């Protein structure tokens, strides 16, 4: 990557098309991950002519994701699982968890449309088992369709909001992201949409300030495709553009695994910048620490390089990873004792084992007296079922006082963290790409990681797929003013 890889990609004026338009449609969708598939389906079912293209075979990062969709407000899956929820409760929680204003129109639209969007997904072949997995973790062990996926049941949120599970997991024993994409792909195949793979969009085409199409490269030739109603960018983010990462989110360059594909090269971001779009949340990131239940992991203690706790261990694993990378210079250790040690799901083991906390501290390079004091204070409070420092739930509090003691290495430099940037092109509640003054760029829409996330502070698993598919459809509703036809608010 070079400095040129951060430069805006300027649009092409329609007058510069030497060969005119090779193809024409109502809606041009660029990218066929979950967001692009949802947008393409919605447009085709609304009666529009659709050309949907992807630089590879489709699926994108969505196909390799965990498949969770963050939905709520009282979905049928929630109700059948015995859980109650409202759009207002969902919005209040997400406003705090994601760092959005509670009256942000985009957040309001997403929460108020959650039930309808859930039903649309189900109607298009994405089932959810009405069963609730109530323990911390990245995903349920079976086909349970509901999980806590944003620390809803942990501090600080449980002090302010009634915990509600909103992470909806498609009913499949494994590879839920791939399953979601396949079901949406099958739904798209039942429409009249034209699907083009191995075709790369190069530049958007404008006419008098309106986006009217794009140039596309395939098999060494470039042609122009006209879009009479609008262009939807759903072609991924910028996790694999190291020049953009260095400029906006340099800490992501320190982790071993950036979630994405080579399609996450920042093309959508650079293209919208070329049209004067506003960007937001560029330093915000999701970073997952690869420590998952069993319970023993949550019952352990996480300390930084000074031997001090800095977070409640029962919270969402993305919050833990973000705190380690952003606030602790990438240094952390998970401490446990003999009765509570079990190898966690990803096989991480306590490589350092000692008879005292002081000895363990010396072995892993922490201040012995400080670590001993940390553990003494924690154990004393845990014996009373309390955590006055970080308010870990009582069910996960046990004294760690039975030798030998072990340390699992959570340092960013030594284990496989996974993450991706959440910032990007700002869109409004109708998925329109907007300028810094809030005015929309006519004819241009974005969804998924081609747009900025709702998450401006912290992340909740399922937001990317949830908002991507939701705003992919929302773009179509705005193009055709078919909110009633599509049953969108």
Model segments located where?
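Extreme N-terminal leader/targeting segments of oxidoreductases
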Residues: 1-27, 45, 454, 487-488
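N-terminal Rossmann-like FAD-binding beta1-loop-alpha1 element of flavoenzymes
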Residues: 27-51
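Glycine-rich FAD pyrophosphate-binding loop
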Residues: 45-65
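Glycine-rich active-site loop/strand segments that organize a redox cofactor
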Residues: 70-109, 122
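Conserved redox-cofactor binding core of oxidoreductases
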Residues: 109-222, 242-243, 385-407
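Glycine-rich loop(s) and the adjacent beta-strand/alpha-helix scaffold that form part
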Residues: 175, 220-289, 465, 471-474
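A glycine-rich dinucleotide-binding beta-alpha-beta segment and adjacent secondary-structure elements
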Residues: 203, 372-458
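An anion/pyrophosphate-binding glycine-rich loop and adjacent beta-alpha core
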Residues: 265, 269-271, 275-372
């Amino acid at each position: 990557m070079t400095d040129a890889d951060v430069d805006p990609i300027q649009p092409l004026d329609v007058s510069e098309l030497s060969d005119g338009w090779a193809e024409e449609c109502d809606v041009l969708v660029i990218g066929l991950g979950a967001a692009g598939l949802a947008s393409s389906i919605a447009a085709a079912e609304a009666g529009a002519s659709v050309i949907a293209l992807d630089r590879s075979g489709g699926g994108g990062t969505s196909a390799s994701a965990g498949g969770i969709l963050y939905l709520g407000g009282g979905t049928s899956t929630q109700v059948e699982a015995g859980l109650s929820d409202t759009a207002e409760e969902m919005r209040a929680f997400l406003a705090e968890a994601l760092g959005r204003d509670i009256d942000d129109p985009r957040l309001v639209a997403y929460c108020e449309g959650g039930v309808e969007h859930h039903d649309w997904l189900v109607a298009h072949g994405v089932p959810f088992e009405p069963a609730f997995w109530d323990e911390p973790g990245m995903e349920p062990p079976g086909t349970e369709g509901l999980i806590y996926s944003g620390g809803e049941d942990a501090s600080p949120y449980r002090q302010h909001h009634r915990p509600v599970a909103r992470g909806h997991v498609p009913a499949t024993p494994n590879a839920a992201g791939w399953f979601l994409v396949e079901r949406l792909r099958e739904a798209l195949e039942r429409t009249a949409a034209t699907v083009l793979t191995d075709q790369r969009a190069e530049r958007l085409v404008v006419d008098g300030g309106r986006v009217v199409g794009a140039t596309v490269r395939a098999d060494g030739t470039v042609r122009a495709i006209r879009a009479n109603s609008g262009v939807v960018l759903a072609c991924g983010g910028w996790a694999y553009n190291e020049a953009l990462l260095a400029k906006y989110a340099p800490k992501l360059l320190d982790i071993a695994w950036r979630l994405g594909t080579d399609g996450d090269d920042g093309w959508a971001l650079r293209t919208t910048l070329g049209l004067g779009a506003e960007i937001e949340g560029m330093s915000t990131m999701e970073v997952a620490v690869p420590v998952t239940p069993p319970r023993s992991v949550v019952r352990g203690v996480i300390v930084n390089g000074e031997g001090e706790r800095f977070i409640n261990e029962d919270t969402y694993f993305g919050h833990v990873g973000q705190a380690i990378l952003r606030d602790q210079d990438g240094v952390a250790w998970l401490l446990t004792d003999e009765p509570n040690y079990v190898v966690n799901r990803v096989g991480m083991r306590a490589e350092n084992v000692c008879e005292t906390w002081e000895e363990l501290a010396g072995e892993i390079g922490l201040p012995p007296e400080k670590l001993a004091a940390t553990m003494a204070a924690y154990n004393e409070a845990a014996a009373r079922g309390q955590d006055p420092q970080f308010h870990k739930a009582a069910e996960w509090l046990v004294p760690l006082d039975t030798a030998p003691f072990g340390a699992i290495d959570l340092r960013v430099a030594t284990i496989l963290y996974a993450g991706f940037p959440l910032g990007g092109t700002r869109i409004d509640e109708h998925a329109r790409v907007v300028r810094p003054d809030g005015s929309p760029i006519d004819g241009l829409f974005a969804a998924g990681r081609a747009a900025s996330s709702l998450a401006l502070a912290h992340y909740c698993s399922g937001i990317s797929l949830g908002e991507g598919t939701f705003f992919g459809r929302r773009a179509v509703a705005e193009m055709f003013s078919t909110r009633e036809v599509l049953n969108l608010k």
